[in-house]
């Protein structure tokens, strides 16, 4: 009997969150280990479908770095990175677009649909969903000066066609977006998936942005998870060395999204089964929430 009572208590805990998020949009960046492990893939698909069935509008933006690396290796193309960004020449861009739009996107869409969803795959080129310009990477030189480096067909999103996404939402579909953007001349751009998720969330004024990662969230210097971070404390946490390395662009992405109108953003542990549901519908969550 106790386990039944526990289930009832879990449902009661979720009720205010179901009411709060009903009719709202949640943008989820899907990547990392959650895309490789079969149990986690199924868990993610069921979480997204559950959100839709509860009247919430999930929008999925996926990555695909490991799949890109594998395919580039097969073609004998060696990747170079500048501050974590892949230098993307024309040959590399062809592979990136092929993998993200023709392989990974279709796999994610197929998995959601196999589990009862109504997912529709998109790239940023469809309906000019993600209009981009070339991103120049700033690199600090030995003499302290900062130089803008051209890293090829790497883009920054300057405009999101939110009408296309909203049309799909109103039709009860789940948009699944590959992070390939389009330039003014029709050229393709490789765009960081976290950046795409943040820009899409901002354009939609989403209730929440969720980034799935392979870590528990943001930790303090003692290694303890910071479950909540106020927006105005982020610069100090970076200066103090609490937020470091690859976590800085993720947190910055969340900050930018909130400043563009997103209510809250979370960096969560995608290695946890049903991490999305646990983050949204429980009091504690499974990562770090960033808010005003």
From Swiss-Prot:
- Name the enzyme group at the top EC level: transferase
Q: Which GO terms describe its biological process?
A: arginine biosynthetic process via ornithine; L-arginine biosynthetic process
Naming one, the record's GO cellular component terms include: cytoplasm
- Pfam families attached here? AA_kinase
**SUPFAM superfamilies under this entry?**
Carbamate kinase-like
Q: Where in the cell is it found?
A: Cytoplasm
Q: What does this protein do?
A: Catalyzes the ATP-dependent phosphorylation of N-acetyl-L-glutamate.
The protein's name in its UniProt record = Acetylglutamate kinase
Q: Organism source for this protein?
A: Geobacter sulfurreducens (strain ATCC 51573 / DSM 12127 / PCA)
Q: Taxonomic lineage of this organism?
A: Bacteria, Pseudomonadati, Thermodesulfobacteriota, Desulfuromonadia, Geobacterales
Gene from which this protein is expressed: argB
């Amino acid at each position: 009997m106790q386990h039944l009572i526990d289930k009832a208590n879990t449902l009661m805990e979720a009720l205010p969150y179901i009411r709060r998020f009903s009719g709202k949009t949640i943008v989820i960046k899907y990547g990392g280990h959650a895309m490789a492990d079969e149990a986690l893939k199924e868990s993610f698909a069921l979480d997204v479908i559950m959100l839709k069935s509860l009247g919430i509008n999930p929008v999925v933006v996926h990555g695909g770095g490991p799949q890109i690396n594998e395919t580039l290796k097969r073609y004998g193309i060696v990747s170079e990175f500048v501050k974590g960004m892949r230098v993307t020449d024309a040959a590399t861009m062809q592979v990136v677009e092929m993998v993200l739009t023709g392989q990974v996107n279709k796999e994610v869409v197929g998995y959601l649909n196999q589990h009862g969803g109504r997912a529709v795959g998109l790239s940023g080129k469809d309906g000019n969903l993600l209009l981009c310009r070339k991103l120049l990477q700033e690199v600090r030189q030995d003499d302290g000066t900062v130089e803008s480096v051209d890293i090829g067909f790497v883009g920054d999103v300057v405009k999101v066609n939110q009408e296309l996404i909203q049309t799909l939402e109103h039709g009860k579909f789940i948009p699944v977006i590959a992070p390939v953007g389009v330039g003014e001349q029709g050229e393709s751009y490789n765009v960081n998936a976290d950046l795409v998720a943040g820009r899409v969330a901002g354009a939609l004024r989403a209730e929440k942005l969720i980034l799935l990662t392979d870590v528990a969230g943001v930790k303090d210097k003692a290694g303890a998870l910071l479950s909540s971070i106020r927006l105005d404390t982020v610069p100090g946490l970076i200066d103090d060395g609490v937020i470091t390395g690859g976590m800085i662009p993720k947190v910055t992405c969340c900050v930018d999204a909130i400043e563009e109108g997103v209510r809250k953003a979370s960096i969560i542990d995608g290695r946890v089964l049903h991490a999305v549901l646990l983050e949204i519908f429980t009091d504690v969550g499974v990562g770090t929430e960033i808010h005003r």
